[in-house]
């Protein structure tokens, strides 16, 4: 099985502009954090690409599932994307990749066109912090673990899912479904979020 296959809110992205999301993964990225959002965003008819941060496109996730990514970091042009998502998992490896830091800096700070979004789940927000992609007054959520909270400092907020400017963050796996629909709501409006939820027999209130 391929696992990866408020009312009247004004959408932030024009309907004519397709939504494209890059999910950046590496060896031992958490399975649920990578696959659940990917599945739901594709249900919303978003173009979602798995981007390997490694030299090879083949990645083994935390629970041993092998996935074939759509592209590798070295061949990816982030200018084509609406958002970049860093899921929970082996973030220590991601922080070591200087090219990823530079690519995301250009993605966020030198945009052409609409606002560029950053998404994180679990300790993915720690990568955004290490790369200085979180503004001093911006709040994000992570797992309520001492080291992560300490790293984020004043940027930490204890919430299951949180939206602040261009960053949408999710604390842990319990909030992945809500997080995925919140992304759809923020990018395309509450109506599409609810329609997508209905496709998977879920009720999303926003």
From Swiss-Prot:
Pfam families: DJ-1_PfpI. CDD domains: GATase1_DJ-1 (cd03135). It comes from the Bacteria. This is Uncharacterized protein MPN_294.
């Amino acid at each position: 099985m391929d696992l990866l296959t408020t009312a009247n809110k004004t959408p932030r992205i024009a309907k004519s502009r397709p939504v494209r999301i890059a999910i950046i993964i590496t060896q031992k990225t958490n399975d649920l954090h990578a696959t659940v959002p990917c599945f739901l965003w594709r249900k919303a008819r978003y173009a979602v690409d798995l981007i390997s941060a490694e030299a090879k496109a083949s990645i083994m996730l935390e629970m041993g599932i092998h996935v074939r990514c759509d592209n590798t970091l070295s061949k990816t042009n982030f200018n084509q994307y609406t958002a970049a998502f860093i899921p929970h998992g082996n973030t220590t490896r991601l922080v070591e990749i200087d090219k990823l830091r530079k690519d995301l800096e250009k993605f966020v700070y030198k945009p052409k066109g609409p606002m560029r979004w950053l998404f994180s789940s679990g300790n993915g927000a720690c990568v955004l912090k290490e790369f200085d992609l979180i503004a001093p007054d911006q709040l994000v959520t992570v797992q309520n673990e001492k080291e992560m909270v300490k790293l984020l400092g004043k940027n930490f907020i204890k919430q299951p899912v949180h939206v602040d400017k261009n960053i949408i963050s999710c604390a842990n796996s319990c909030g992945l479904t809500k997080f995925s629909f919140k992304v759809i709501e923020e990018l395309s409006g509450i109506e599409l979020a609810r329609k997508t939820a209905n496709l998977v027999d879920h009720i999303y209130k926003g």
